[in-house]
Amino acid sequence: MNLAIVEAPADSTPPPADPLDHLADALFHEMGSPGVYGRTALYEDVVERIAAVISRNREPNTEVMRFPPVMNRAQLERSGYLKSFPNLLGCVCGLHGIESEIDAAISRFDAGGDWTESLSPADLVLSPAACYPLYPIAASRGPVPAAGWSFDVAADCFRREPSRHLDRLQSFRMREFVCIGSADHVSAFRERWIIRAQKIARDLGLTFRIDHANDPFFGRVGQMMAVSQKQLSLKFELLVPLRSEERPTACMSFNYHRDHFGTTWGIVDAAGEPAHTACVAFGMDRLAVAMFHTHGKDVALWPIAVRDLLGLAQTDRGAPSAFEEYRCAKEAGS
């Protein structure tokens, strides 16, 4: 779920207005770091309603898991993320040591120094994707049955990609459906979801296209991995033209990992071979931004079919809409 966006040089004139900037005040609260925002009630309500639509499309016999925003560092290292995307990883650090050592760090801060020199890494990292904590859990259950396993997972995720663009957050929500089983089983799962996800996007009133894609692997070796990923059709994305047709935003992705996680974690299928895995990922914040950019900030004016799908009751004539309530509150606070 990544899209390269060119940033203006640091010494350039202020960048021109981005096509999504008009949404910022209605949807987000600045928190002092690019891509990290507080979220308004108007925005969160739509995120939750999109999540409900996705849940209604969940396949039978799918196990639901919800993960915290952090995961075990050793598990992420074993999964291979550090080798593929080291530049995107966020590691949890803390002030460890005896009282005098911690006091020294505080004293350094009081004196105007850099207290972070005393930080050392914990055994946790910020989760870069919702599915990574799943694989060691699945591995602990023994062989995968012939019918395979299907999971619905979600997490608050983090990738160190500071950006002023509202469709590239550092802290974001990801929802995934993950399939573990034989190569044929997980390939069929991905094909079903490519079709199903397009219907969801159409029902949401979004303009989109499906295209081959690759992850932003790090370094020169990563460039070769990206070419291979594309050539083997291991990744597709559902792209929404929020800025233009030439610079679309990936709001969903459809990924086939082959036996990478099966081999890494010792997950075997019913035949005793390394299990294959696939996932469909929904960028919940990108989908919500796409909805507001497509249909406007006042949900009362969204197409009736979209409102019905999301369960938005028709606004009574004369009653203020959620956006009008937000606008009044904004004006009262200014």
UniProtKB/Swiss-Prot annotation:
Catalytic activity entry: an L-alpha-amino acid + holo-[ACP] + ATP = an L-alpha-aminoacyl-[ACP] + AMP + diphosphate
Keywords: ATP-binding, Ligase, Metal-binding, Nucleotide-binding, Zinc
Cofactor: how and how many bound: Binds 1 Zn(2+) ion per subunit.
Miscellaneous comment: Lacks the N-terminal tRNA-binding domain compared to class-II aminoacyl-tRNA synthetases.
Residues binding an L-alpha-amino acid: E176
Chain residues that bind ATP: R159, E161, R168, L169, K235, A250, C251, M252, S253, R286
Cofactor: Zn(2+)
Species this chain originates from: Bradyrhizobium diazoefficiens (strain JCM 10833 / BCRC 13528 / IAM 13628 / NBRC 14792 / USDA 110)
Function field: Catalyzes the ATP-dependent activation of L-glycine and its transfer to the phosphopantetheine prosthetic group covalently attached to the vicinal carrier protein blr6284 of yet unknown function. May participate in nonribosomal peptide synthesis or related processes. L-alanine is a poor substrate whereas L-serine or D-amino acids are not substrates for ATP-dependent activation. Does not display tRNA aminoacylation activity.
Alphabetical list of InterPro entries matching this protein: aa-tRNA-synth_II/BPL/LPL
Family named by the database record: Belongs to the class-II aminoacyl-tRNA synthetase family. Amino acid--[acyl-carrier-protein] ligase subfamily.
Positions of Zn(2+) binding: C131, E176, C279
Name of the protein in its database record: Amino acid--[acyl-carrier-protein] ligase 2
The keyword ATP-binding belongs to this UniProt entry's keyword annotation: yes
GO molecular function: ATP binding; ligase activity; metal ion binding
Subunit note: Homodimer.
EC number assigned by the record: 6.2.1.n2
